[in-house]
């Protein structure tokens, strides 16, 4: 089988003056005028961008520069046609356009590579983005090479019936398939409110443009915070559509700066400073680690498409609903004007362009922070996430103004205690998000919560370099959104009947549970027993086979009926929980013998007591005892699991 001609990363860039480029105008006709939500009425000339990647910084003053980035998928067998012998073709494209081009390595298990294209251009004197983009010109050239590589080189690619999945010209049909990787926060500019923009682009270009659903077999190189935009149609029509899509993406990528003229700081320079190898590594890790279903919606069909190939819309009669999602972010009181001020604020952007409601709490004596509340009407199958985009804009406003000496920034979200449980499980624990993004993500202790916050809230604090912190915020909000809709769905679904064995089905062979003899039975009788099993089972299935097992789950309980202020059903209150976790033999040398201090860290972060069981000479297994309130015990177990996962994934 013929393989790609090269497996190396190709990086081509050079310092160039953004005002003296080899080409003076774009090749494709991309003057298009679109109205509708997500972008307003804008005329695009040249330019493109928004894939979410690394732009090479120019030596010019960063405050006057605008970075544009694209990411296009190329089948591995066609990569040689883009690179050329010894990189001659890609070098020629770079020299002709002045853009930086990076052909990513092939991720194991993928059939496609990402080709990343970036540029840095000086802004116009009034702060507007440049009218011409070298990155867009290079995108067109790379796209041409992808389409031409089959005829020029030949390759042992996929069969004709699978050709659409990889991009290129479908044999005999003349249909072209092109796929761009786009940051989730920029997808909204292509969809518009109610899908109006994407439908208008389809009609205008006579192509089929769609956001691929997550149930598709997407490449592993595409992270959870990215989507694939696929364009299908005749050759010239697809080129036309690519010009329009890339122009809208570029406008979205630079919307922050175009709305904040006169600002002295920009997140772009911090993104560039974060390192060029960070994001590709993060994509591979997050694709491998997080189950997609916990973060992503599974239906991205347009609600207005007449195309036969569009993902099927929800049938009439199903319960299609939208709910108000609410997020809260803490803002330093002296910086609140940067968000809501008439001259410097971004309220108009948030309310009119993104479509969210924004409320700011009154100052509270003794607190140097105020709460900004973001709310938006969203549906579970809506790929556009307005509340998340609004949070990212607010994060940019705050962090650009108060970076510390180490170039680290801090973002603090307020989350209701009842929702914070989704951040403590295997699939989305703060420790896993922290590990994957390179940030510190913590649930702060009760005494660290500011006075302006409710006693029923917890503070999730993200600390790290700006680009990593934004990625962590994306992953965190995706998880919270998924949990919120799950909660809403469960409220409308009748509760399933419970039994003493039901909650533990599916984990046999992985977990071993036994109630200790000192459990105090309450007046609820069998109901209390069921509650114990259910409570434990919310934690137990999160361990993978071989990662560890719970030997005993004993609870010293004092139960009483307590009034419930929400619509949830009243349940007995469990005040103390004790778990004993059997450690796999393979992780003991690293977790216990070599790194005993990790247990102290888990104890400190969770508030639970985490100790090694040493008072049983006859015991041959390695057991960790966790004791504390149910919340503390669950948090400690999640942290312990995170350490075990990281140790096993690192290998021997």
Curated annotation (Swiss-Prot):
Induction trigger: Transiently down-regulated by heat stress. Down-regulated by salt stress, osmotic shock, treatment with lithium or abscisic acid (ABA), and low or high pH.
InterPro entries: KH_dom (IPR004087), KH_dom_type_1 (IPR004088), KH_dom_type_1_sf (IPR036612)
Compositional bias of kind Basic and acidic residues: 1-14
PROSITE patterns: KH_TYPE_1
Phenotype of gene-disrupted mutants: No visible phenotype under normal growth conditions. Mutant seedlings show increased tolerance to heat stress. Mutant seedlings show increased sensitivity to salt stress and abscisic acid (ABA). Mutant plants exhibit increased resistance to the fungal pathogen Fusarium oxysporum.
One GO cellular component, as annotated: nuclear speck
Tissue expression pattern: Expressed in roots, cotyledons, leaves, flowers and siliques.
Superkingdom of origin: Eukaryota
Region Disordered: start-end pairs: 1-63, 253-307
GO biological processes: heat acclimation; jasmonic acid mediated signaling pathway; mRNA processing; primary miRNA processing; regulation of defense response to fungus; regulation of gene expression; response to osmotic stress; RNA splicing
Low complexity bias spans: 292-306
GO molecular function: primary miRNA binding
Domain KH: 67-139, 175-245, 324-391, 408-476, 576-640
Keywords: mRNA processing, mRNA splicing, Nucleus, Repeat, RNA-binding
Gly residues bias: start-end ranges: 34-55
Classification via CDD domains: KH-I_PEPPER_rpt1_like (cd22459), KH-I_PEPPER_rpt2_like (cd22460), KH-I_RCF3_like_rpt5 (cd22463)
SUPFAM superfamilies per the UniProt record, alphabetical: Eukaryotic type KH-domain (KH-domain type I)
Subcellular location: Nucleus; Nucleus speckle
Purpose of the protein: Acts as a negative regulator of osmotic stress-induced gene expression. Involved in the regulation of thermotolerance responses under heat stress. Functions as an upstream regulator of heat stress transcription factor (HSF) genes. Negatively regulates HSFA1A, HSFA1B and HSFA1D, but positively controls the expression of HSFA1E, HSFA3, HSFA9, HSFB3, and DREB2C. Forms a complex with CPL1 that modulates co-transcriptional processes such as mRNA capping and polyadenylation, and functions to repress stress-inducible gene expression. Regulates pre-mRNA processing under salt stress.
SUBUNIT field: Homodimer. Interacts with CPL1. Interacts with RS40 and RS41. Interacts with DRB1/HYL1 and SE. Interacts with CPL2.
Name of this chain's protein: RNA-binding KH domain-containing protein RCF3
Species of the source: Arabidopsis thaliana (Mouse-ear cress)
């Amino acid at each position: 089988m013929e393989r790609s001609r090269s497996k190396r990363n190709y990086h081509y860039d050079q310092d160039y003056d953004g005002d003296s480029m080899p080409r003076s105008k774009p090749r494709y006709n991309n003057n298009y005028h679109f109205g509708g939500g997500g972008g307003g009425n804008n005329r695009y000339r040249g330019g493109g961008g928004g894939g979410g990647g690394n732009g090479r910084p120019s030596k010019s003053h960063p405050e006057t520069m605008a970075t544009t980035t694209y990411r296009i998928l190329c089948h591995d067998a066609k990569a040689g046609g883009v690179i050329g012998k010894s990189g001659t073709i890609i070098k020629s494209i770079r020299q002709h356009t002045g853009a930086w081009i990076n052909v990513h390595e092939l991720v194991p298990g993928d059939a496609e590579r990402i080709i990343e294209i970036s540029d840095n251009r000086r802004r116009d004197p009034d702060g507007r983005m440049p009218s011409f983009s070298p990155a867009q010109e290079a995108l067109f050239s790379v796209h041409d090479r992808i389409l031409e590589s089959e005829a020029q080189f030949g390759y042992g690619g996929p069969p004709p019936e699978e050709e659409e999945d990889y991009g290129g010209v479908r044999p005999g049909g003349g249909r072209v398939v092109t796929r761009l990787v786009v940051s989730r926060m920029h997808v909204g500019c292509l969809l518009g409110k109610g899908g109006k923009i994407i439908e208008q682009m389809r009609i205008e270009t006579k192509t089929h443009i769609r956001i691929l659903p997550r149930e598709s077999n997407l490449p592993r190189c595409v992270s959870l915070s990215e989507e694939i935009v696929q364009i299908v149609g005749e050759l010239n029509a697809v080129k036309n559509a690519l010009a329009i899509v890339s122009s809208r993406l570029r406008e979205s990528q630079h919307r922050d700066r175009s709305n904040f003229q006169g600002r002295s700081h920009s997140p772009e320079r911090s993104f560039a400073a974060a390192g060029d190898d960070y994001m590709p590594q993060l994509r591979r890790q997050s694709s491998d680690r997080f189950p997609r279903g916990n973060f992503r919606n599974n239906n991205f069909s347009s609600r207005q498409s007449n195309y036969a190939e569009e993902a099927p819309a929800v049938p009439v009669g199903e319960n299609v609903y939208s709910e108000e999602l609410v997020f809260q972010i803490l803002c330093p009181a002296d910086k609140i004007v940067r968000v809501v001020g008439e001259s410097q604020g971004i309220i108009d952007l948030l309310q009119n362009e993104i479509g969210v409601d924004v409320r700011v709490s009154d100052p509270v004596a003794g607190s140097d922070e105020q709460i900004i509340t973001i709310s938006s009407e969203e549906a579970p199958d809506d790929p556009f996430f307005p509340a998340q985009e609004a949070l990212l804009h607010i994060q940019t406003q705050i962090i650009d103004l108060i970076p510390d000496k180490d170039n680290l920034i801090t973002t603090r979200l307020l989350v209701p205690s009842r929702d914070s449980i989704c951040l403590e499980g295997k699939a989305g624990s703060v420790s896993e998000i922290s590990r994957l993004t390179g940030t510190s993500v913590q649930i702060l202790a009760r005494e660290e919560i500011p006075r302006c916050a409710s006693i029923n809230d917890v503070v999730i604090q993200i600390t790290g370099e700006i680009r990593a912190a934004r990625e962590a915020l994306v992953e965190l909000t995706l998880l919270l959104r998924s949990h919120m809709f799950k909660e809403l769905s469960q409220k409308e679904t009748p509760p399933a009947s419970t039994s003493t064995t039901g909650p533990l089905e599916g984990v046999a062979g992985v977990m071993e549970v036994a109630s200790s003899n000192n459990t105090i039975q309450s007046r609820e009788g069998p109901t209390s027993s069921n509650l114990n099993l259910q409570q434990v089972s919310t934690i137990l299935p999160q361990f993978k086979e071989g990662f560890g097992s719970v030997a005993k789950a004993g609870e010293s309980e004092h139960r009483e009926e307590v009034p419930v202020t929400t619509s949830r059903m009243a349940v007995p209150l469990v005040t103390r929980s004790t778990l004993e976790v059997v450690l796999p033999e393979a992780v003991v040398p690293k977790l216990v013998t070599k790194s005993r201090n990790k247990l102290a860290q888990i104890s400190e972060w969770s508030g639970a007591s985490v100790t090694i069981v040493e008072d049983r000479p006859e015991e041959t297994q390695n057991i960790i005892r966790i004791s504390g309130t149910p919340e503390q015990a669950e948090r400690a177990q999640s942290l312990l699991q995170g350490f075990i996962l990281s140790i096993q994934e690192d290998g021997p």
